[in-house]
Amino acid sequence: EVLDARAPAASQNPMVKELGAARQRAHLKILNKSDLADPKVTDQWIQYFNKIPKTKAIAISCKKANEPKKILSLCMALAPHRGTPLKPLRMMIMGVPNVGKSTLMNAILNKRIAKVGDEPAITKQQQRHQINDHMILVDTPGMMWPRIEHEHDGYLLATNNNIGKNAYNEEDVAIELGAILLKQYPELLKTRYEVKEL
């Protein structure tokens, strides 16, 4: 499951968790866009996810060429009984819209196969690709659950462009984001806007 490293909790799809539990599948949490996130907070999330049974976590940035390649070896470690021509390792990339699933797949395959863009819902259908004779990778459209339970999560998803612009009021989102930044990163705001007081 690809998550936005800037908002791992908000960008987790509860349906993915239910699906993994029901089918008893190993789960790799990929915190993408880690270059845009607070590294200390990202490390805390990695530690948290790694404590969950049958789950591993990694923080990456698809802008760094070698980082996506680590994912294949992690997937093999999660499913050691797979990875042969008779029992290929099947990996499915899932997540909410616009967290970088298709960009990640292109990086893993080292080809521009999947269409990418800075807006939700670029991928319209599943795309299946044979990496080699023992690995298969499937890219899926972004999946949103029927109702976002926590308003704060909705604001974070809107801020990171994970949901369509018709689903929220931009002014409300800007106010919420401003409040978050004032509380958590006041010094960065002062530096960014070259002010002494906020």
List the predicted regions and their residue ranges.
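Helix-rich effector regions associated with P-loop NTPase G domains
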Residues: R6-H27, S34, K40, K54-K56, ...
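Residue-level signature of catalytic and energy-coupling elements of molecular machines
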Residues: D4, F49, L104, D139-T140
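Glycine-rich phosphate-binding P-loop
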Residues: M91-V116, T140
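Canonical P-loop GTPase G-domain recognition
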Residues: R25, S34-V96, I113
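Short, glycine/charged-enriched secondary-structure capping and boundary segments
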Residues: P14-E18, D43-I46, L72-L74, N106-I108, ...
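Short, well-ordered alpha-helical segments in soluble proteins
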Residues: C75-R82, I108-R112, P120, M135, ...
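Structural beta-sheet core signal
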Residues: E1, K29-L31, I93
